[in-house]
């Protein structure tokens, strides 16, 4: 099968979920004897795979990259045909549906969330909600803001309508597409995210701590991911004083960056515990397993907003488990049920610092329980959530959408 990924596959310098997803899916689809074409700003990206053809997009400003991308993609699609065009971007899906149907046998669209929900949550957390409310109440600026939102929804609806197959990463997203966008259920298949079980694997904890310059005796609690509003990291900060009252030497590793970082640092200062937190900022993807393996317990304290509506299939959960670590996470669809099925951790009510602190403390207190849950986590992810198994499902869906 000859596939073209319409989204730019950026160099994997960062531990960013969207970038990781693209790299892992592309590389594993190539292992299945598919010919994969990608656009990238770094010609070395995935070029070591025999079945991946890299099409270089000259970097620069956002406007420059966008212009170069459209020129490169128009030239490629104009000169070659493909079995499948694949995208996670509604704009690309919309344009492909309008202009590229004669150049492919199937158009496949993947959805990892509800874009307007994520956008609204980020704006509300960054203090823009009041401004948006004013715009909605009247005036020309309110009119254009509303028009922009309607246009985004229209583009997404068209992209979904043009698609031959749609992949949703959670059952909640599928249900939302059926009810809010009137997409037929038989057009949508749920395929969860996964973990790179070759990269994310158990490593010696002491060696990892030495590598990172961490204390060898203190217990460490780890969070990995984008510091976005829906991650709920503020509840881990709020839980920390209770944990520290029982385990004064405990430390907290916050691995990643995002719009909430400064707020989280300020919150730790308010509690007088900023010296117990390590905010690493951006970390290369291949270094993330070192931080996870240096830790005793890993966390995913997701909030209800956005997450309860669509459920979750979080990379961090599978990566924690692939490293053989016990997990404390919010009881949200896709997370709590994975912990229940695997017996690899404890689920707690979302947005509840007390329950979060109690569960983390329970694991810190019991080394045998941590070891048992970690072992079960590893087995569960290896059997069910490797990126290779995800790619096999995507491969089957794409081939089923091809029209001869």
Model regions: which residues?
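A short, well-ordered alpha-helix in the C-terminal region of glycosyltransferases
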Residues: 249, 355, 362, 369-383, ...
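Conserved acidic donor-binding segment of nucleotide-sugar-dependent glycosyltransferases
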Residues: 341-342, 346-353, 362-368
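Membrane-proximal helix-turn-helix segments that form the acceptor-binding/catalytic region
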Residues: 70-78, 94, 98-102, 109, ...
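Conserved donor-binding/catalytic core segment of Leloir-type glycosyltransferases
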Residues: 4-6, 215-240, 253
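Nucleotide-activated donor-binding/catalytic signature segment of Leloir-type glycosyltransferases, i.e.
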Residues: 255, 262-290, 294-297
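Carbohydrate-associated surface elements
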Residues: 172, 194
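Acidic donor-binding loop of glycosyltransferase active sites
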Residues: 164, 276, 292-310, 325-326
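N-terminal subdomain of nucleotide-sugar transferases
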Residues: 1-45, 50-52, 80
